[in-house]
Amino acid sequence: MSNLDYKQFTERHRPHIQPPDSIIFVTYRLAGSIPRATVREYKARRVWLEDQGTHIKNKLRRNKSPEAKRWLEQVEKFKREWFVKFEEIMHSANTGPMWMKDQRVADIVAAGLQKLDGDAYRLDAYSVMSNHVHAVFKPFLSGNDLIEGLKEGRPIFTSEHPGLSRIMHSLKGSSARECNLVLSRVGQFWEHESFDHVIREGKFYRTIRYVLNNPVKAGLVNQWGEWRWNYCRIELIDKL
């Protein structure tokens, strides 16, 4: 079986399931592409937010209290602010790894995204840049796909489709091995953490345009279609 075949999950590791029909915008980057001091600041603030969430866990489950609502708003604001900050750093970077400048490496990363199209997700768009990748896709896994059972007295969940964390593990793992081989290097290739969020209603085409225009914004091409490592699902092109 491939690493995306039939899966088993314990209760503790039950996959995070997005709302039905959710479309995900994800950004993942090379290890070391953001200065360590910036990463430390980000992680410290994230831990603080997580601690606040632990204190109001029961309220968050009900999602009704003003305190829980304020915390969720803080989380969304935090994610937006740091996404923008990381983007600015990566686009203006003149130091740090830029392995995808090597066409062989960029081709491997793009091929990995294409490989899971129709298997783990419906791929809508991606852009492979020198030190990071943007992708938009719709995972096939939903809450209705999970089958609950027992194994050695413990609850488990099985599904034919991988969750988001498993998708990212597959994308990063296989491409990291191939890219390191091409580059004759060893060590961590991708940063472990990725940015991801569900695209809100009415923001889909705006997000697609943002992804595809990354190389245009960086001054690498004049039109997004000129960038070899851009992809857009053909049904969407006329609507951009």
Q: Model-derived features: where do they sit?
A:
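Short catalytic/metal-binding and nucleic-acid-binding patches
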Residues: M1-L240
